[in-house]
């Protein structure tokens, strides 16, 4: 039976977890954030996870709070730049978050920097 895994990540700290999960034999769908305009020239910049997916031929989707991943058996979130809404979590159960620091001492948006 195929298990459908979703990985939610958006920065360089996500990539080691994505690499490990991607090395398994099961299907994986990567969900990441859309490119943003940044810098003086307001150039469109893609995040490291999208870059990694493109260079390794891994299929990815852009995140939407309204999406329902009805075939998801398990979701893993690591260093993802979005906060899941309650509605999203209720529609898409079985999402686990990998927190990169000790809680509650090192909480916040950038606890390990």
Listing of model-derived features with the role each one plays in the protein:
Residues 1-113:
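One-carbon transfer enzymes
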């Amino acid at each position: 039976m195929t298990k459908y895994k979703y990985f939610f990540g958006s920065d360089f700290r996500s990539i080691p977890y994505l690499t490990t999960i991607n090395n398994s034999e099961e299907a994986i769908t990567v969900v990441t954030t859309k490119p943003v305009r940044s810098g003086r020239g307001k150039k469109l910049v893609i995040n490291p996870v999208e870059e990694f997916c493109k260079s390794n031929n891994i299929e990815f989707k852009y995140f939407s709070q309204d999406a329902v991943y009805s075939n998801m058996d398990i979701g893993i979130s690591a260093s993802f730049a979005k906060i899941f809404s309650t509605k999203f979590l209720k529609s898409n159960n079985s999402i686990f978050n990998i927190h990169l620091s000790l809680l509650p001492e090192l909480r916040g948006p950038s606890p390990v920097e």
